[in-house]
Amino acid sequence: MDIKFGFADTARELVISAAGDQAELTQKINSALADNSTLELEDDNGRKYLVRTDRVVYVEVGIAKKHAVGFAGA
C-alpha cells in the first residue's frame, strides 16, 4: 500500500510503501489527523516514520502499481 503525504509550504511529498489493509491505514491516519498528533508508520523494509500531522495538507492512500519495464508491447 502506498501512502503519499503532502505538506504545507513545500512542493516535496513523502511516499511510504507500507504493508497493511487500506481501511486500517486510513483509520489510523484519520485518527492522527483528528487529534493533531504524531503519526507513526512502518514501511515494507522495517523503517519507521514519524509524521507531524499539523503540517499535512493531503494524504493519498492506494495500492502500489507496478510499472512495466522494457519494450514489451511497444
Which residues does each PLM region occupy?
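Short, surface-exposed polybasic-and-hydrophobic patches located at secondary-structure transitions
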Residues: I3-R12, H67-A74
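Basic, polyanion-interacting recognition surfaces, primarily
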Residues: F5-F7, S17, L25-T26
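Short beta-strand segments
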Residues: R12-L14, Y49
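C-terminal structural segments of small proteins and small subunits
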Residues: Y49-A74
